[in-house]
């Protein structure tokens, strides 16, 4: 690729940390899937809306706290993932932190994605989550190709975020449609 070793090292470091940042979102998703499935099975549909509101609220608080921590301590944390020294290490850390800062600001979008997708799955719908996954793929790929032409290497940082947004644009209206038609 044309991004260079320093860029790839920084990008990779942030992606390693991203896996950790997503852990709470994944856990909230597992919880809401079980909660929703149990309430669908019991015919207590009104509880699904309450659970979803609580899940979104907890997700927003968590994602904003994580974002603040990453903006404050991100460079220090990223330095644990970057082994290069000298100018290469400084350059990789600069790339990594820029990507982390951008990603952190938009972390609530990812958390909404996990909670909403999982709630829909708990309601028994597997098609909307699959379609949203396809939207993520095409948004990520399209953004990576287009935005790098427009913004250079910084364009790649927005591919993940716009992939999340693309999925949310399918999942959020889908949730409301399903919830209205559930009972």
Q: Predicted regions span which residues?
A:
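Hydrophobic alpha-helical segments typical of transmembrane helices
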Residues: 7, 32, 95, 115-116, ...
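Hydrophobic/aromatic end-of-helix segments at the C-terminal termini of transmembrane alpha-helices
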Residues: 3-4, 32, 73-77, 143
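Small-residue-rich hydrophobic transmembrane alpha-helices
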Residues: 10-68, 72-74, 110-132
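Short runs within selected transmembrane alpha-helices of multi-pass transporters and secretion channels
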Residues: 26-29, 103-122, 128-140, 156-172
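Short alpha-helical transmembrane segments in multi-pass integral membrane proteins
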Residues: 36-105, 147-183
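Transmembrane alpha-helical segments of integral membrane proteins
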Residues: 139-148
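Interfacial/gating helices of multi-pass transporter permease domains
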Residues: 1-19, 88-95, 125, 158
